[in-house]
Amino acid sequence: MGFSSELCSPQGHGAVQQMQEAELRLLEGMRKWMAQRVKSDREYAGLLHHMSLQDGGGRGTGPYSPISQSWAEITSQTEGLSRLLRQHAEDLNSGPLSKLGLLIRERQQLRKTYSEQWQQLQQELTKTHNQDIEKLKSQYRALARDSAQARRKYQEASKDKDRDKAKDKYVRSLWKLFAHHNRYVLGVRAAQLHHHHHHQLMLPGLLQSLQDLHQEMACILKEILQEYLEISSLVQDEVVAIHLEMAAAVARIQPEAEYQGFLRQYGSTPDVPPCVTFDESLLEEGEPLEPGELQLNELTVESVQHTLTSVTDELTVATQTVLSRQEAVAQLQRELQNEEQNTHPRERVQLLAKKQVLQEALQALQVALCSQAKLQAQRELLQAKLEQLGPGEPPPVLLLQDDRHSTSSSEQEREGGRTPTLEILKSHISGIFRPKFSLPPPLQLVPEVQKPLHEQLWYHGALPRAEVAELLTHSGDFLVRESQGKQEYVLSVLWDGQPRHFIIESADNLYRLEGDGFASIPLLVDHLLRSQQPLTKKSGIVLNRAVPKDKWVLNHEDLVLGEQIGRGNFGEVFSGRLRADNTLVAVKSCRETLPPDIKAKFLQEAKILKQYSHPNIVRLIGVCTQKQPIYIVMELVQGGDFLTFLRTEGARLRMKTLLQMVGDAAAGMEYLESKCCIHRDLAARNCLVTEKNVLKISDFGMSREEADGIYAASGGLRQVPVKWTAPEALNYGRYSSESDVWSFGILLWETFSLGASPYPNLSNQQTREFVEKGGRLPCPELCPDAVFRLMEQCWAYEPGQRPSFSAIYQELQSIRKRHR
C-alpha cells in the first residue's frame, strides 16, 4: 500500500492536501512549543542563578549547623544546574529548533510543488483525453456531413459539366475526411497512451515521490525530536550527578545531632534567679507580725473564711480545667498516633500543625497545673490556719484590748444580744478601701443613617432565607440580609402575603435597586423609606416598617471597655459604653480557659434576665457570644454593691433610707416570685445601689426558673453560700421562693448591722449545726423591733411558715410609714 496505489483519485488528492495542512500545523505547534521551552529554560536558569546570588551560595549569617552545610551544598549545585540548563537552552535553540524551522520551510515548498505538479498533470490529461479528442470528433462529424452531401450532389448530377464539378467537390471532401480521419486515429492513440502514462506512471510517480519525501521528512523530524529529548532530558549524566550531590547533602542531615554544635557553642549552666521570699524589712515600721505567717484574729477571721471559700471555688474551677485539658491532650495524642500509622513518612508535614496544637495543649496543661498547685497551696495554708483556731473564738487584736477593757459591764451585757461595735469598726475599715472607678469617655454620636451596615437594627447578617418569612408579619415589613454563599446583600419585603427578595446592585461604589445610586445601603434604605418610592416600577412595592434583629445580640465591636471594676466567679467585670448611644454599661466577662459547661452556667444569668423588666432588677442589655471572651452586658449601677455601700455609708444613712432600700429588695424579689424564679444567692453583696440609693437585685448566676417554683440541686455544697442558705436547701438541695425568703432575712440582718458578716465566729459547718439546733442571729443594735420580728419570721425552720415576698413588701412599707 502506498500513495501511488491508494490516493490517485480526486478524493485522494483532497485527503493529501488536508494531511499536508494538518502536518504543517503540527510542525508549527512543535516550533512554538520548542521556542517556549527555550525561553522557559533560559528564564528558569536565570531564576536559579538569581536565587543562588541572593542566598550567597548557602552561606548564612547564623551559627554553623549540619543543615546549613547541606543547604550550602544544595545551593552550590543549584548554581551548576542553572549553568547546565542555560547551555541546554542554547543547544535547543541552535539545534532542534533551527532544524525544525528549516523542515517547516521545506514541507511548505513540497506542498506547493506537489499541488502545482498535480494541477499540471490534470490539465494535460484533460486537454489530451477530453478537449483534443472532442475537437477532432466534432471536426470529423462536420467533414463526414460535407462528404455525404458532396456524394449526393455528385450522384444526382445529370449533365457532364455539373457532374465534373460535383465530382471535384466530392473528391476534395473525401481528401479532407480521409486526412482528418487519420488525425483522429492518431489523436485517439495519443490520448490512449497519455491516459496510460497518466494513470500508470506519471500520477503514481508523483504520489510515490511525494510519499518518499514525506517519509524522509518524518525521519528527519524523528531525529530532531530525539535530539530535543537528549538535550532537554533531566536524566542526563550531568543533571543526575548534580541531583546525586544534592541528595547526598540531604542524606548527611542527622536530626538527632543537628543542634549539638549549637549547644557546644552557646550552651551554659542554668541561671535560675532566686525565688521570692518574704521581705522582712516590711515589718520594721509596722505591726509586730510573723513573716510568712497568716494573721488570724478578730479583724481577719471573716476575710480568711471568705478567702478560703473563694480559693476553694477557684480551685474547683482550676481542677475542672486541668481535667478537661488532660482529656484534650490524651485525645490529641490518640489522634496523632492513629494518623502517624496511616500517613506516609513523606506526608508527615501534614501532621506538624496537629503536633504544634499538642505542644500548645501540653503547655496549657502545665499552666493549669501550676494554677491548680498555687490554689491548692493557698487553700492548705488557709485551712491549716482555721483548723489551728478550732471552734474557739479568734484571738483579740492587742491594740484594741484597752478599748475592750474600758467598756462598761452594762454595755457588754447589752452587746451580747446586739451586733458588736467591733463589727461596725471593721465595716468602716473595709469601707476605706471602697473601689472607685473611672468610665470610658463619651463617644461622638453618629446619625443613624451614617452608621455602618452591621450597626443597623434592620440588618440581620447571614440570615437564612427560610427564616425571613417568620420575621416579616405585615405588608411592607422589611429587613436587609447577606445572601448565603454569594456575597450579595438582599432586601427582603413582605408584600401581598408573600416575602419578596431584591438583590441590591453594587457598581462603582454605589448601591441601587432601580434609579439613583447611593454611597451606602443605609442611605439607600433611608431614601426608600422616607420617599415611599417603589423598589421597582414593575413590583410597586414600598417599604413600611423595619424589622429589627434580636435586641439581645451584640457584637464585641459594639462596646468600648473601661477599667476593671470588679471580679466574679467567672471572670473580671469592666465598666464600658455602647458605641451606638454612649449608654453606660457593666461588662461581665467569662474566662476563656473555663470548660464549656461552666461557660453555659455563666450564660444562665443572661437567659434568666432576658425575660424580666423591673426597676429593682438589674437590667440586661445584651450578650456577646460571637467570639471569646464571652460578655454579658448589663446596666451600670454606679453606686456599687450594697454590702460595700453599707460598710462605707451606713453610719450616715437615716433609718427611713435603710427601710426604703430593703423595701426595694423585697419589691424585686416579689417580682421574681411571681415569675417562678428562684434566686438562690440573695445577699447584700449581690445587690447593687444606684446613685439615688435605689437598690437592684443582681447576680443571677445561680438562679433557676421552675414551673412549680421548686428546684432540686445536685453536686454538693462547694459553691453554696452556707450562711445565707435555708436549712432545707443545705440538707436536701430543695430550693424555692421560701428558701429565698430565708436569705432575705439574712439580707435584712446585714442591712441593719451595717454590713457585718453573719455568724462571724462560726465556720460553715458550725453554722449549719447552730441553725439546726434552733440558733438564730441576734438583733442588730440599730434594728427596729418590727424589722427583727420580720427577720425571725423569715427564719422559720419550716418553709411553709415563712411569709411570701408580697407579705414582706407590704410589712416593710407599713413599718416605713410608721417610722419617723
From Swiss-Prot:
Residues 1-298 are annotated as: Important for interaction with membranes containing phosphoinositides. Residues 458-547 form the SH2 domain. Residues 123-163, 318-389 form a coiled coil. The active site is at residue 681. Residues 401-417 have a biased composition (Basic and acidic residues). Transmembrane segments: none annotated. Residues 392-418 are annotated as: Disordered. Tyrosine-protein kinase that acts downstream of cell surface receptors and plays a role in the regulation of the actin cytoskeleton, microtubule assembly, cell attachment and cell spreading. Plays a role in FCER1 (high affinity immunoglobulin epsilon receptor)-mediated signaling in mast cells. Acts down-stream of the activated FCER1 receptor and the mast/stem cell growth factor receptor KIT. Plays a role in the regulation of mast cell degranulation. Plays a role in the regulation of cell differentiation and promotes neurite outgrowth in response to NGF signaling. This is Tyrosine-protein kinase Fes/Fps. The gene is FES.
